[in-house]
Amino acid sequence: SGPGQSRNYGSERATGEYHVFFDSDCIIPKQYFEVVNNRLEKEKVDDYGGPDMAHPDFTPIQKSINYSMTSFIGTGGTRGSKKSVGKFYPRSFNMGISRKVYDTVGGMNDLRHGQDMDLSARIYDAGFKVGLVTDAYVYHKRRTSLKKFYRQIFNWGVARVNLGLLHPKLLKLV
């Protein structure tokens, strides 16, 4: 099973009001859930996400890759920046969905890459409220070589084309 099926397995058994997803290569700061709870008390959303960043202990190559993946220059701010060229789509490295969302739109599909973007697109299409919690960041470990990073970006490019076939509005220049 891939990441989508594993997350669905957990969601089918979850009993809480929200299902929270992280990637296995993320480090969650101790204040994360307090930050999310404070935000949800002020403004209830059905789907939320937060940014990812480099931990101070990461290697120089990981920090460089992180910059290329989180800077406005590298992504147009689409990965959780207050400044963005497009709509914010929560991604499963740092994402929470309400039980109502899961029961209405279902879980993640079986795409190997991009299953989280597909879910976020379906959540928007169903009319649910989506929010960015900028202070609910995670430390996301990056690839340790340029070769591994290239492979990751290549796979994401394939995913972007597949997502464009499922959701034409997602296939755009950023």
Where do the language-model regions lie?
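Short aromatic/hydrophobic "clamp" motif used to bind/position activated sugar donors
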Residues: 19
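Catalytic donor/gating beta->alpha subdomain of glycosyltransferases that bind UDP-sugars
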Residues: 109-171
